[in-house]
């Protein structure tokens, strides 16, 4: 090295010797360790100059040549490199090896006879005229390579590179190699020269070998290891530069890079160079006919070409060029192929357009046919060489004709087949349209309501699918869906009718509870007709609700068979049978005068009623006509200001039956008068059969002449009025606002609102004729009802023909259109029979309200629903009333062939046998039956006439004496059908007498009233009236009875003590104190006398009532209740809890059991009877919590009709479990308008008051709502199920109470849960007197929602939104903006806009479920609220309409455009009220992207 520095001071020169395992195949294996490749890559790194094969087996001549020069080392030449410190140096590279004789396979003899280990460690090398080594091919051809001699023929070695092969070498043991290397290292170490271990062939390295090599190096002092790969050119330069740093201590230490990291860098460098080279080739080479020589010359000077050739070599560069040429040629051929294939259909259309010519030809035969066509050469060219894409034809751009050999390819065959299909499609389009329709009709997968997207998958593989366009599919499918949906709905309606017993047993009302709806779905769930509407659940639920509405409120209009309802047919038949020209005018004058007439009671003291009546009359025309919706109505007003117990102030008179009542007040005293008058009016009719005053529509109005809407007094009156309206279940109207006019009590808009409500109630009434009193029996002897099923496959004309054509048939005196009079000989005398022909649904209500001596019930033998309705009807009929069953068949042949007809005939006969009724069948083919077939039945009726009449009279008396809340709540007792539209009977218009005896030992009503008067003078008078009113509704109140001859009862002290005890127990017992005075022409001996006036404990055998057995002889039959349990659930008026003593104790009596219902006598009736007592009758809002009973209490039974029916032993366990889980107290709770947490504990001045009282123009948002939403957005946006999961009721009540006391309540400090706050917020809206979305706006919203076009629909909804009252609009905007924000976090809280709308629409809209429109529009309401939440920016912030659900903005700008609507506020001169909940730092605004998550509907 010192000599090198003397020669060149500037550029240092280092001599490096590369050593490692060498020798024969025995020592080193079949290949070397890679010393030559390492030297080759370092000295000549270009890929073209790198050689993998360097042999050590040489001939004697090669060994003696100038390159080897009889030495066992190779001189690789001189290399100049710039090291890391940018200092250039020169290196002479020498490889120490051992050459093998190719003859003896022993090492060649050399001048140095030392072993390899010692020879490799030599530091002085000398060989005169030794040439630089390139590769094996150089040996023997030295003149063909550059000849460069080793400098001065000698070198002094400055350092050693010790190579270790870490690959899996063939026939080489790595451990032996390590031993060799260890010995070699020890020898090299003696020279004191730097040594670096080089691991070669790391690209094929074995992990263990590499680890062992590092272990070996660590065992030596300061021995560095470099992992290399000469083939991949990884770390080769690093190995030599590391050794140079060790040689020259003054140079910086080289960082040794691990192999895989260096390999990654090298691979990235090669990949970058390749990409640049490919780009260069694609830019230069555009034609697939280019060659490598010309292109390589063009790229010679390009750095991209040079870099890639340097790294990968010329051969790889050429390979990439050829790949590019091949790709260009392929693309060119494909372009030509596409042109030819595109022209091929045109050639087919021109040459073979006739389907008949080619219909059955294959492509091969069609090819021959093409050659015969005259214009063949115009479209095709026949090439001498094939295939066409391998010939020069591909470059013949001028000839666009199709190569004929293209017809042999698969795409050409497919085009030919497509041409055939096209021709066939044109021929068979009409046929396939019909085939598609038939396929839809026969496919079992096409079910009602299945969307087209789902149905398409079932017909995709059908042959005819390709023959129809999408629009044709959808048109056919839409029509087919309409047909099958209509059919499925009809079948489902028939299913509901087949389960008539279930619906009547459940005693459903206008708002069925969730439990009852669950039972209905559970019972019907397994029916195929129920499952058929699985995809139309909304429509199915609407049908169920519609059917429930029909069951609860049966009219001709709600009848499922409308307009073919039996009632309409019967009315038409009877009216056309008896109408006469001379009677037309009379008939018109006798028609119902109330059709276009409104009778309105106005109740208000101190002149309020009279003043309002005058104001309303001032708005009417001269003849008291009022215009509503363009139609003229006669308005009859009855102002009442005094004591309603007096006849002059009675709500109803013989000529006036009210349709509604306006209740006016302007002070606490006038409000107390209203409550007391309503109480008295209802109380006076509790015992009547036409107690419709109990359900009279009421409207409570606060009169405020001055229009002053401020002040504590007014707010207090409003709040009290709302509470009273809630208790009375009536409408409360806000006081008339200022600007109406001086002196006005109510504006015209409010009057129209009230009258419209009355019209709606009036239209829903289908009043059955009032019950005939006993005195009317002088007109007719028997009253028979004939029941027909609507929709049965027979004609009512044929059934009634024998009746109407009978000579004895006459028009009914009562003028009814559904009854006739018959005079028939029964026994020895003629009897006058009133025959009423009604549908079953009209007959249900008269089973209890009308005196009926017998029923003739028809049913169709081939219709299940017909017999099911008959069973449901008979369940509630008393077993003393004779029944005639009539089965209608299609003839004897049909009965034999039809299993259903045979089964239903058999069941009808069995029912008749079990109830001791009569049965007959009439073929519909021979409907001209004779009335004589009913004569045995008429005889049965005559025999039981007396006991039926006595039973009817007793039931009315017993019902009056045991009236409970059921009178008010039962859908049967309270149904409009049970009321009368005719004038009251004389007994009904008599003034009410004292209900209790004026006896000091008995509770006195007069005392109650005196107490009431004293309490009214105090501040709590109103609350006392309401509590008194509720208590009277919840206790038994006897009816007023008429005077009767004095009858003295012996009431012992024990009796009175029992009564006192009962009074202390809270049971109100009543004793009639007024004598029963007979009227003119009244014979007391003809009628049963109620005998339940004396209060006594009953024995097992008790006197119930007495029946006149023979009026001429004065004998009386006393009927006793032998088995009390038989009266359970009868609904026929519960037994009085008072024992009675007979008026005829000394007379002979006969014992008869008290009548029961047919359901108790017939096993085929009442199969769903166990459901009757499983629920508390009422709507969801009325049910309240389940009341649990003790087992022993349940075993003792329950007195009266509401006793629990025990489970049957053979009952279905699943059904029994349902009943047990849903079992409720059988006593019906008093109806409540809505559960309110404020009613139970305190009277709030904030909750449950009108919205206008809790907002101001400065603060348009209620402070409570603002606090709740701020709290929820700060802590609860990520709460799963927010608004769906209910909060704790007691905590919600506590929150509202605390806020009521302190409006500055901090929710965070109180540590309320998020669900509690959310529930309290919903409760605030639920308790508003009117919903946040006004009812009149709901109608407009529904109409706007019906618009099909989405954009037009949204604009229409926005216009309706502008009509909201200002207060409602601001709060609605605030709440919807908050819900929109909640929906943005649906991935966390799982509350999408759909889920939120399901939870909120009942709270915000509160629809009136007493109307069918509201019942069937629930899905519409929910969708409207969902749209408001989804499109909140559009509705409230003038933003564009957002994408529909499932869409996403296509760019960041699109997203941004949907985000900031909540944060942008318009610049105004005044502070604007809060428009939406402010964004919190924890929850930044997110894009308004709709979500498709689903959640269950849980309110």
Swiss-Prot record:
PTM statement from Swiss-Prot or TrEMBL: Phosphorylation of Tyr-1105 by PTK6 promotes the association with RASA1, inactivating RHOA while activating RAS. Phosphorylation at Tyr-308 by PDGFRA inhibits binding to GTF2I. Phosphorylated by PRKCA at Ser-1221 and Thr-1226, induces relocalization from the cytoplasm to regions of plasma membrane ruffling and prevents the binding and substrate specificity regulation by phospholipids. In brain, phosphorylated by FYN and SRC. During focal adhesion formation, phosphorylated by MAPK1 and MAPK3 at the C-terminal region, probably at Ser-1451, Ser-1476, Thr-1480 and Ser-1483.
Positions carrying Phosphoserine: 589, 770, 773, 970, 975, 985, 1001, 1072, 1134, 1142, 1150, 1176, 1179, 1221, 1236, 1472, 1476, 1483
Region described as Has GTPase activity, required for proper localization: spans on this chain: 1-266
Annotated GO CC locations: actin cytoskeleton; ciliary basal body; cytosol; nucleus; plasma membrane
Limits of the pG2 pseudoGTPase domain: 783-947
Transmembrane segments: none
Residues with Phosphotyrosine modification: 308, 1087, 1105
Domain FF: 270-327, 368-422, 429-483, 485-550
Biased composition annotated in UniProt, kind: Polar residues: 1124-1141
Residues modified as Phosphothreonine: 1226, 1480
Tissues expressing the protein: Detected in neutrophils (at protein level).
UniProt keyword terms in alphabetical order: Cell membrane, Cell projection, Cytoplasm, Cytoskeleton, DNA-binding, GTP-binding, GTPase activation, Lipid-binding, Membrane, Nucleotide-binding, Nucleus, Phosphoprotein, Repeat, Repressor, Transcription, Transcription regulation
Activity regulation note: Binding of acidic phospholipids inhibits the Rho GAP activity and promotes the Rac GAP activity.
Coarse class of the protein's main subcellular location: cytoplasm
Required for phospholipid binding and regulation of the substrate preference, as annotated region: 1213-1236
Biased composition (Pro residues): 1471-1484
Low complexity bias (residue ranges): 1448-1470, 1485-1499
GO BP terms in the entry: axon guidance; axonal fasciculation; camera-type eye development; cell migration; central nervous system neuron axonogenesis; establishment or maintenance of actin cytoskeleton polarity; forebrain development; mammary gland development
Positions of the Rho-GAP domain: 1249-1436
Location of region: Disordered: 1058-1089, 1124-1146, 1177-1207, 1446-1499
GO molecular function, one term: GTPase activity
Locations listed in the record: Cytoplasm, Cytoskeleton, Cilium basal body; Cytoplasm; Nucleus; Cell membrane
Domain notes: N-terminal part (1-266) has GTPase activity. Required for proper cellular localization. The pG1 pseudoGTPase domain does not bind GTP.
Subunit structure, interactors included: Interacts with RASA1. Interacts with the general transcription factor GTF2I, the interaction sequesters GTF2I in the cytoplasm.
UniProt-recorded name of the protein: Rho GTPase-activating protein 35
Lineage: Eukaryota, Metazoa, Chordata, Craniata, Vertebrata
């Amino acid at each position: 090295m010192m000599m090198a520095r003397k020669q060149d001071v500037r550029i240092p020169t280092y001599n490096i010797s590369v050593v490692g395992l060498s020798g024969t195949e025995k020592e080193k294996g079949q290949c070397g360790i890679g010393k030559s490749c390492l030297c080759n890559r370092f000295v000549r790194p270009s890929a073209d100059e790198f050689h993998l094969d360097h042999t050590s087996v040489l001939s004697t001549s090669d060994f003696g040549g100038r390159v080897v020069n009889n030495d066992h080392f190779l001189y690789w030449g001189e290399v100049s490199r710039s090291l890391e410190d940018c200092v250039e140096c020169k290196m002479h590279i020498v490889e120490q090896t051992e050459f093998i004789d190719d003859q003896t396979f022993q090492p060649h003899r050399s001048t140095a006879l030392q072993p390899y280990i010692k020879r490799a460690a030599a530091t002085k090398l000398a060989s005169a005229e030794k040439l630089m080594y390139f590769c094996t091919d150089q040996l023997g051809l030295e003149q063909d390579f550059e000849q460069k001699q080793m400098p001065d023929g000698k070198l002094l070695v400055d350092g050693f590179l010790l190579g270790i092969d870490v690959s899996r070498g063939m026939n080489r043991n790595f451990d032996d190699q390590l031993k060799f290397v260890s010995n070699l290292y020890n020898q090299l170490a003696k020279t004191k020269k730097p040594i670096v271990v080089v691991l070669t062939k790391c690209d094929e390295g074995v992990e263990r070998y590499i680890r062992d090599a590092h272990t070996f190096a660590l065992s030596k002092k300061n021995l560095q290891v470099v992992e290399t790969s000469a083939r991949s050119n990884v770390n080769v330069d690093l190995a030599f530069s590391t050794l140079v740093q060790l040689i020259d201590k003054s140079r910086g230490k080289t960082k040794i890079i691990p192999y895989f990291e260096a390999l990654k860098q090298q691979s990235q460098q090669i990949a970058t160079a390749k990409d640049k080279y490919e780009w260069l080739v694609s830019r230069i080479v555009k034609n697939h006919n280019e060659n490598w020589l010309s292109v390589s010359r063009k790229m010679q000077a390009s750095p991209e070409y040079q870099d890639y050739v340097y790294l990968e070599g010329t051969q790889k560069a050429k390979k990439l060029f050829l790949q590019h040429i091949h790709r260009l040629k392929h693309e060119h051929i494909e372009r030509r192929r596409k042109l030819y294939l595109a022209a091929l259909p045109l050639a087919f259309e021109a040459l073979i357009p006739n389907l008949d010519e080619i219909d059955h030809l294959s492509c091969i035969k069609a090819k021959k046919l093409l050659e015969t066509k005259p214009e063949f050469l115009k479209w095709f060219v026949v090439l001498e060489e094939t295939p066409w894409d391998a010939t020069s034809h591909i470059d013949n751009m001028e000839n666009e004709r199709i190569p004929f050999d293209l017809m042999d390819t698969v795409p050409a065959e497919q085009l030919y087949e497509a041409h055939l299909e096209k021709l066939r499609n044109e021929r068979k389009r009409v046929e396939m349209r019909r085939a598609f329709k038939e396929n839809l009709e026969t496919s079992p997968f096409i079910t009602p309501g299945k969307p087209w997207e789902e149905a398409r998958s079932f017909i995709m593989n059908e042959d005819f699918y390709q023959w129809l366009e999408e629009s044709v599919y959808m048109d056919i499918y839409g029509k087919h869906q309409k047909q099958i949906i209509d059919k499925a709905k009809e079948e489902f309606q028939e299913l509901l009718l087949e389960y008539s017993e279930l619906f009547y047993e459940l005693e459903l009302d206008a708002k069925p509870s969730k439990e009852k709806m669950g039972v209905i779905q559970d019972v019907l769930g397994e029916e195929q007709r129920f499952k058929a509407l699985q995809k139309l659940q909304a429509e199915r639920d609407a049908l169920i609700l519609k059917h429930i509405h029909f069951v609860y409120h049966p009219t001709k209009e709600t009848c499922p068979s409308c307009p073919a309802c039996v009632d309409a047919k019967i009315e038409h038949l009877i009216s056309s049978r008896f109408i006469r020209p001379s009677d037309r005018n009379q008939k018109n004058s006798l028609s119902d005068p109330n059709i276009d007439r409104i009778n309105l009671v106005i109740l208000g003291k101190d002149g309020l009623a009279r003043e309002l009546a005058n104001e309303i009359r001032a708005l009417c025309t001269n003849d008291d006509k009022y215009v509503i919706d363009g139609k003229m109505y006669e308005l009859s007003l009855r102002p009442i200001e005094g004591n309603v117990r007096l006849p002059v102030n009675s709500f109803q008179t013989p000529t006036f039956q009210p349709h509604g009542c306006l209740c006016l007040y302007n002070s606490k005293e006038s409000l107390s008068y209203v409550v007391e008058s309503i109480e008295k009016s209802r109380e006076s009719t509790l015992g009547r059969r036409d107690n419709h005053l109990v359900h009279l529509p009421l409207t409570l109005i606060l009169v405020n002449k001055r229009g002053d809407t401020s002040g504590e007094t007014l707010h207090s009156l409003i709040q009290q009025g709302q509470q009273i309206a809630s208790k009375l279940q009536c409408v409360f109207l806000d006081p008339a606002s200022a600007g109406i006019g001086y002196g006005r009590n109510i504006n015209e808009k409010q009057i129209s609102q009230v009258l419209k409500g009355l019209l709606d109630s009036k239209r829903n009434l289908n009043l059955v004729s009032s019950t005939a009193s006993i005195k009317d029996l002088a007109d007719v002897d028997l009253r028979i009802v004939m029941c027909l099923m609507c929709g049965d496959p027979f004609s009512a004309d044929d059934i009634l023909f024998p009746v109407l054509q009978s000579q004895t048939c006459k028009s009914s005196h009562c003028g009814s259109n559904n009854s006739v009079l018959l005079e028939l000989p029964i026994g020895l005398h003629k009897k006058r029979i009133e025959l009423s022909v009604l549908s079953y649904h009209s007959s249900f209500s008269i089973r209890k309200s009308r005196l009926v001596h017998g029923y003739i019930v028809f049913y169709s033998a081939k219709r299940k629903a017909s017999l099911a309705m008959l069973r449901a009807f008979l369940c509630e009929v008393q077993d003393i009333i004779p029944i005639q069953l009539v089965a209608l068949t299609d003839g004897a042949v049909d009965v034999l062939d039809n299993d259903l007809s045979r089964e239903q005939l058999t069941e009808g006969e069995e029912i008749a046998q079990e109830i001791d009724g009569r049965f007959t069948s009439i073929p519909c083919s021979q409907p001209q039956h004779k009335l004589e077939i009913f004569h045995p039945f008429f005889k049965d009726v005559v025999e039981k006439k007396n006991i039926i009449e006595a039973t009817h009279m007793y039931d009315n008396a017993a019902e009056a004496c045991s009236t409970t809340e059921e009178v008010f709540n039962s859908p049967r007792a309270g149904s409009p059908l049970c009321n009368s539209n005719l004038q009251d009977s004389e007994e009904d218009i008599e003034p009410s007498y004292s209900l209790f005896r004026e006896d000091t030992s008995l509770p006195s009503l007069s005392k109650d009233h005196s107490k009431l008067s004293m309490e009214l003078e105090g501040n709590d008078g109103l609350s006392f009236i309401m509590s008194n009113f509720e208590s009277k509704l919840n206790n038994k109140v006897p009816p007023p009875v008429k005077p009767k001859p004095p009858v003295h009862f012996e009431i012992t002290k024990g009796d009175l003590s029992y009564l006192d005890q009962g009074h202390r127990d809270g049971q109100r017992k009543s004793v009639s104190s007024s004598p029963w005075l007979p009227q003119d022409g009244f014979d007391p001996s003809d009628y049963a006398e109620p005998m339940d006036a004396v209060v006594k404990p009953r024995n097992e055998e008790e006197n119930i009532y007495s029946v006149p057995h023979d009026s001429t002889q004065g004998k009386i039959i006393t009927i006793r209740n032998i088995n009390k349990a038989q009266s359970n659930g009868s609904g026929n008026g519960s037994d009085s809890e008072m024992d009675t003593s007979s008026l005829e104790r000394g007379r002979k009596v006969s014992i008869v059991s008290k009548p029961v219902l047919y359901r108790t006598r017939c096993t085929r009736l009442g199969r769903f009877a166990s459901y009757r007592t499983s629920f508390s009758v009422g709507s969801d809002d009325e049910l309240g919590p389940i009341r649990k009973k003790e087992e022993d209490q349940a075993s003792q039974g329950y007195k009266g009709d509401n006793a629990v029916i025990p489970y049957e032993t053979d009952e279905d366990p699943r059904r029994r479990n349902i009943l047990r889980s849903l079992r409720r107290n059988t006593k019906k709770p008093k109806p409540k308008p809505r559960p309110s947490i404020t009613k139970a504990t305190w009277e709030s001045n904030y909750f449950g008051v009108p919205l206008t009282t809790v907002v101001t123009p400065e603060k348009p948002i209620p402070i409570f709502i603002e606090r709740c939403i701020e709290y929820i957005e700060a802590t609860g946006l990520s709460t799963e199920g927010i608004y769906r999961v209910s909060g704790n009721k007691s905590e919600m009540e506590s929150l509202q109470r605390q806020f009521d006391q302190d409006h500055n309540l901090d929710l965070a400090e109180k540590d309320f849960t998020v669900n509690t706050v959310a529930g309290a917020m919903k409760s605030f809206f639920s308790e508003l007197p009117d919903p946040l979305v006004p009812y009149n706006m709901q109608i407009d919203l529904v109409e706007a929602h019906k618009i099909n076009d989405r954009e037009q629909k949204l604009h229409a909804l926005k216009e309706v939104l502008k009509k909201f009252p200002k207060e409602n609009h601001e709060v609605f905007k605030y709440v919807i903006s908050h819900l929109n924000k909640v929906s943005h976090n649906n991935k966390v809280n799982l509350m999408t806009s759909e889920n939120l709308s399901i939870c909120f629409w009942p709270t915000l809209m509160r629809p009136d479920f007493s109307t069918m429109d509201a019942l069937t529009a629930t899905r519409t309401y929910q969708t409207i609220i969902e749209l408001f939440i989804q499109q909140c920016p559009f509705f409230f912030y003038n933003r564009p309409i957002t994408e529909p659900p499932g869409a996403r903005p296509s760019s960041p700008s699109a997203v941004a455009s949907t985000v900031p609507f909540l944060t942008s506020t318009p610049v105004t001169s005044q502070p604007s009220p809060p428009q939406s909940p402010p964004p919190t730092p924890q929850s930044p605004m997110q894009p308004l992207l709709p979500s498709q998550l689903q959640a269950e509907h849980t309110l």
